Amino acid sequence: MASYQVRLINKKQDIDTTIEIDEETTILDGAEENGIELPFSCHSGSCSSCVGKVVEGEVDQSDQIFLDDEQMGKGFALLCVTYPRSNCTIKTHQEPYLA
């Protein structure tokens, strides 16, 4: 099973940390396992509480049902159903910017 280095960043929240997450663990679960508290609500990809923005790298969020193609094209990802597919950098706490 492959594992990837996932860098989580957010200046306002004073977050800049890199954690290792395997390809079968969501980014939200990987963060929680490493003691990083990120916002969430449904844990099923049907709301926007956990939305982040992929700055660099590849992810799989095919299980999500909330974001439209335009939002995903801008890099937004629901971290509760997003799996790393490469080393990546993700801005956390992005719900206010989703509009």
Swiss-Prot record:
Function: Ferredoxins are iron-sulfur proteins that transfer electrons in a wide variety of metabolic reactions. Donates electrons to the nitrogenase.
GO molecular function: 2 iron, 2 sulfur cluster binding; electron transfer activity; metal ion binding
Protein name per its UniProtKB record: Ferredoxin, heterocyst
Record PROSITE patterns: 2FE2S_FER_1 (PS00197), 2FE2S_FER_2 (PS51085)
Family the entry assigns: Belongs to the 2Fe2S plant-type ferredoxin family.
Cofactor (UniProt): [2Fe-2S] cluster
TM segment ranges: none
Gene3D superfamilies per UniProt: 3.10.20.30
SUPFAM superfamilies according to UniProt: 2Fe-2S ferredoxin-like
2Fe-2S ferredoxin-type domain residues: 4-96
A GO BP annotation: nitrogen fixation
Keyword Metal-binding: yes
Keyword Electron transport assigned: yes
Gene giving rise to this polypeptide: fdxH
Binding positions for [2Fe-2S] cluster per the UniProt entry: C42, C47, C50, C80
S-S bridge residues: none
Cofactor note: Binds 1 [2Fe-2S] cluster.
Domain of life: Bacteria
Keywords annotated in UniProt: 2Fe-2S, Electron transport, Heterocyst, Iron, Iron-sulfur, Metal-binding, Nitrogen fixation, Transport
Other remarks on this protein: This ferredoxin is expressed by heterocysts and differs from the ferredoxin expressed in vegetative cells.
